[in-house]
């Protein structure tokens, strides 16, 4: 598997295999996206709720940056059309 010059589709496939991905031109060092799995949260009744959607399963793309983790990151059109993704 190549490690740089990836399309967004190739980056998604790499994340499904446990890899971290980033774009060359992102601002800030150490920023990347990865696939988060086994997602759960504590609701207002202090109950742990496991997220498990029939279509997407229990996974979401997480953006890790200088301010922490953003779960459910959404790619821009520029992100989706770029071929400058690389494996971290």
Question: Predicted segments — roles?
Answer:
Residues 56-88:
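Short, compact, well-ordered microdomains
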